[in-house]
Amino acid sequence: MDLRMSVEDREEFLAGLHVGILGVDDPRDGGGPLLVPLWYSYRPGGPVTIATGRQSLKARLIRGAGRFSLCAQDESAPYRYVSVEGPVVGVEDPLPRAEQEALARRYLDAETAAAYLAANQEQLVDDILIRMRPERWRTADFSAFAEEFES
């Protein structure tokens, strides 16, 4: 049984509302990759966009590696995930206000987004926007697999 998603399905899934898990090589002390949850945005055919502090560990490691991975998943059955990996294709410093607002509104209702932006105004001036072009896609949709057990 092929669990891979079609191109259209994987792009639609990645564009949906999920907290992403960012992965980037962390060569310090011979450790494994840095994996952290974060907000992201994606439009089919475009880059994955993340925001992070200019001097954050994430930003420093991404600058060093020149690429990163991002995984989004459904945490309830039927389980699905999309994982993308690719090179950084753009950095905007500072993070444009319109992008800050769009990202907050993606994850929060309008009132909560406005409160979040106001409360974090000082921190957000230190944020940058990083864009990654997905080159490698890994996907799985366990819907059909789950249907076999239901019938």
Regions of interest found by a model, annotated:
Residues M1-M5, V82-S151:
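Charged, gly/pro-rich active-site loop segments
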Residues D2-I21:
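Short, basic/aromatic recognition patches
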Residues E11-E12, Y40, R60, N120-E122:
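Short secondary-structure boundary/capping segments
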Residues L17-R54, I62, F68-A72, Y81-V84:
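Short beta-strand segments
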